[in-house]
């Protein structure tokens, strides 16, 4: 008799990478798990979500929230993305991203990144324009270290950060395309 547990993870392939990237890019919200510095207990909240051009999740949160203080004390966190449909919610794809979050308002050298993130976030979440410039709100960028994708029953994958990354060479062409597409749509 063996004590070895059967590995239920599937090998990561292009279909899994595509599904993972799609889950992040199409998510309008996520569950954000942070660590309470007072006692180390987990705390979960919901945040509106968008992505930076490189595919990194970004969110806007208020300094008045407990998760803001938690992230300031310890940037380690996780995001759960995935939209359940009708029926059994466990039958739908979902993914937990594990990493750290960075407050973009703390660094003057991140001003260009902050402007880019704000623009993309507000295109995805236009109602946030009402409070995005309030002094107690800040944009945070999530840096993924690894992810756990559940693509549905029997389809589990352990992903590396590189599985979710947009290749550096593609970023500029994507940025150029996005700018032209937005200008074209605004002109129509």
Task: For the regions a language model picked out, list residue spans one by one.
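An N-terminal domain-cap segment
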Residues: 2-72, 80
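C-terminal edge-of-domain segments
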Residues: 2-9, 14, 129-188
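Short, structured beta-strand-loop surface elements
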Residues: 6-7, 66-127, 134, 144
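Residues that form generic nucleotide/phosphate-binding pockets
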Residues: 23, 120-124, 180, 184-188
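Residue-level signature for short turns and capping positions that connect secondary-structure elements
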Residues: 37, 64, 84, 147, ...
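Residue-level signal for secondary-structure boundary sites
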Residues: 40, 107, 148-150
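Conserved hydrophobic/aromatic beta-strand scaffold that supports enzyme active sites
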Residues: 44-48, 96-98, 139-141
